Amino acid sequence: MLTVATTPEQAKQVISEWKAQGLTVGLVPTMGYLHEGHESLIKRAVAENDRVMVSVFVNPIQFAPGEDLETYPRDFEADKRLIEGAGATLVLHPEPADLYIPDASTYVNVDGITAELCGKTRPTHFRGVCTVVNKLMNISQADRAYFGQKDAQQLAVIRRMVRDLNMNVQVVGCPIVREEDGLAKSSRNTYLSAEERTAALVLSRAVAEGQRLMEAGERSAATVLDAMKQLIEAEPLARIDYVEMVSWDGIKPVETVDGPVLVAMAVYIGKTRLIDNFIFGE
């Protein structure tokens, strides 16, 4: 039986009952329009915790003006079916006014690690992400929180926030879930036309090319990135936002691979911005 909480207070009431029984709690934060990638996070959380809270909340403060806040896909009825089927028992689905009181003036900034990759072109994005995730961790009193590697920089940023603020929660990163043809599953894939959907495969092909080169011994970032960029630029519908290699622990640009690295990209296919990545040497 799935309990739907629409306010933090309702969720906290359920959580306090769980905690009183000594139960462990897993948290899966989402923006809804759930797919098999989210489902894999929920199932892992269910396997590793006594109870699981999933949040479904399109977080307005992580969108900049002109981004897709208003058009971001929503289908809460379908989300509820997937959440219940995956075994979670609590979903928090608040309105923005329920999570952010009108005179709220506290935000969570993680500096440095947010300056590269998505943070370059979306400078306020991670402030919004960290603020809402911090709130959800507080509401849920989670023992573990689950995030997909598709948003690899987000995963690194949240780990840093939890470390720096001595938060009592384990951050669990989970593998990217892909379509059969390799495209990373994303709620934004629904924006793509049939032609764009085919063109979008250039991201996973670039990932495969980068992995192939590095597994064959290539350690020059420029060589790997140039090969990936050439592949993407050959697709007429693709426009590169960034293709970069950074250290996995500090998200700082590297020239030569001598430790774990994140190779990440953001690419516009038509008007839709898609991301993909791989981690090497972890």
Residue ranges and their predicted role:
Residues 227-282:
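Phosphate/ribose-recognition catalytic cores of enzymes acting on nucleotide-derived substrates
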